[in-house]
Amino acid sequence: MTTASIAPERADTVGLAGQGLMHTTLTRLLAGTCSVLPLDLSLNPPSDGAAAHAGLDACGGAVLAGDGWDPDLHRAFNAECLARALPWLLVYVERGHAVIGPCTLPGQAGCSLCAQTRRNAARFDAQELSQLAERFATEFAAPSGSWLTTCGAELVAALVADELGCLTSRPHQARTRNAVVRVDLAELVVSVHPFLPDPWCAACGDLPDDTEQSAWIVTRPAPKASLAGYRVRPLSGAQDRDRLLTRYVDAQVGIIPSLTKNGDSMFPGARAPIGLRHSFHQSNGSGRTLTVQAAEITAITEAMERYGGLAPCGKRTVVRASYAQLGDKALDPTTLGLHSETQHALPGFRYQRYHPDLTLSWVWGYSFARQRPLLVPERYAYYGLRHREPAGRAFVSENSNGCALGGCLEEAILYGLLEVAERDAFLMTWYARLPVPRVEVASLRGRTAALIIERIEHTTGYTIHIFDTTMEQRIPCVWVMAVDEQDRPDQPKVMCAAGAHLDPERALEGALLELARQLQYATRGYRDDRDRILAMVADPRKVRVMADHAPLYYAPEVFDRLLFLVDTPRQQTFDEAFHGRPGPNADLSTDLHETIGRYLDTGLDVIVVDQTGPEHALEQFACVKVIVPGAVPMVFGYDHRRIHGLDRLYHVGYELGYHPRPLIHAELNPHPHPFP
């Protein structure tokens, strides 16, 4: 793409619109460097609400400058300039800061509307600010009084003049290309804040339609960075962290507004919040590893995984129909595990009944069993859409099950499938009350996991229990449990976590680090929430959200629900539990196809929805949602559990030798699960 700049034949003429001290100062300063053409900002209201700006056609570029914040005016001016392929620069004042930029260049993504969208998503108080701006729109747009002094206006005007010079003759040096410059009007400190263009931008975005052709997946060789690893390019060092920080993290307009470290816990941790465009919902990426840098990188990459899974960011959904209309072009939603009629009859149940004539939006995925593209319900593939649309439009409760980010498509699919395996194994064990083997902690001697356990037990006084929950696909899965065997007052009785990986040691390490994260906060949470927890013990319907499930089992009153595991008669060493594992492959694609084959061999399909957006591709990431119809989905909230129609719950325990016969529905575990 060529670098756009102010049109050279009109470069000496800059259209200047606006009012107030900022506008007056800029008019005077620019008069000595170029021809300034005053622009009329009076509204000549057309049907689309855009402003009519006389003289724009005679300019090589334009500036809109004012002493307040008027997003409606900014949006209208942006539309007028884009319609004329006219470069322009925004200058305004908001709450103690002057903001310069972004410069909007014709034919290039990244405009003032993109910047505002990123800004809104980055703010933790976006909802409150939106309400204030709506109620006090006139006050927000008015001059900012004492915040903008003559000295401050002179500084900002000088920065604007220099920026216009860059846009005229050296656009590659412009500081406001996909960035905003903020000037603290109290301290006169200048900072630059880069942002990524919004592919969904109504003004400059150009998302392609989601098509059947684009959904085809042809796996390619993916050489591993090391034979013992499972990544094509592991991210772990300071250089990787700094690059990701620069790309994604900015307090003002970043996809990730902050990255915080937690250094007061057993193991390094980090947190990266992320907002959803056109919504006030925020999610979080978190990292819990053995080094600070790795924890920060994990938090950033998990946040970017959330970004891809919450809502489409790479393709525009175009298919809307019923399953009855689509037939074999679509996934049968009844294979995903639905809510039962009993659940639908509950007062206020938020999900609608599914039936084949229900009209849904669909996105294209790829079925490895059918070896062709397959339509998947959009609300199943993107779990954040519930925050932008009424919940009643969804027919199931779904979350980040099977979502993963990878250094290539093959890596992302593998890790998405491993998450499906982890959660399916945990819930199969829970609902079918499988007395899976205990893994002897003493048999871990010499492994990293043994050191993690030693630190947890020494620091907290809890005893760690490990169980092998590997299911019929033979993917190593573990359930770990921290039990307060001393029955200390005000201490949570038990906490659980899970892990899955082709390398069982990594599965165990990941589960233990997740357990350590819980232990850090559990004691205080138990003391503060004791009454609420006891209410959930008495009434499982009070277990409503993810944050309720683990605390329920802090209560010693319900420890007996876990005795089917704690009292299991089966016991193995770590090597006995995971012997016979295939040797390492040099190519990750080989690992992926072997893993997919294990599901296909047990009658389960593997479906992949590519969620990769332009923001992921900038760092050569791939983002996916892996769906395995028939696997038990992790759902939070007792009323939302989804086990209706999942036949594996009844017979897999029998086939694996844990039960003498297949179960019937009345024998399934009726209690809320303890997954964190």
Segments from the language model and where they lie:
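Helix-biased "structured C-terminal domain" signature
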Residues: 176-676
